[in-house]
Amino acid sequence: MGRVRTKTIKKASKVIIEKYYTRLTMDFDTNKRIVEEVAIIPTKPLRNKIAGFVTHLMKRLRHSQVRGISIKLQEEERERRDNYVPDVSALEQDIIEVDPETKEMLKHLDFNNIVVQLTNPTAPGYSNRRN
């Protein structure tokens, strides 16, 4: 099992990451020096624990978002993704190709005003494995 980290270590680490994200790395020694510069931490063991948790969170941030940490770069990326509008809508086509089952479903749902074109469903063919 891992070590239990106190609320102080977690809060301090999150604040340091939010403010100094661009300076921090995946390396403990580098992060230890940065934490020493940017924060007034009374003891050496506490500084090392905070630097260790900062390194741990930076490694997690590399793969995905971490709850409770909002980084401007991530927020801008999320906004850009949310505001994306495609040039051509998939729904505004003149004719939509569907299989007979889907056409029947649309008829039951009273979507008769949509122009659909039937296509023959192609089941995945099984090749002869014994040559």
UniProtKB/Swiss-Prot annotation:
The keyword ATP-binding does not apply. GO terms for molecular function: structural constituent of ribosome. The keyword Iron-sulfur does not apply. InterPro entries: Ribosomal_eS17, Ribosomal_eS17_CS, Ribosomal_eS17_sf. GO terms for biological process: translation. PROSITE patterns: RIBOSOMAL_S17E (PS00712). It holds the Pfam family Ribosomal_S17e. One of its GO terms (cellular component) is cytosol. Keywords: Ribonucleoprotein, Ribosomal protein. HAMAP family: Ribosomal_eS17 (MF_00511). PANTHER family: 40S RIBOSOMAL PROTEIN S17 (PTHR10732:SF0). Belongs to the eukaryotic ribosomal protein eS17 family. NCBIfam families: PRK01151.1. This is Small ribosomal subunit protein eS17. It comes from Anopheles gambiae (African malaria mosquito). The lineage of its organism: Eukaryota, Metazoa, Ecdysozoa, Arthropoda, Hexapoda.
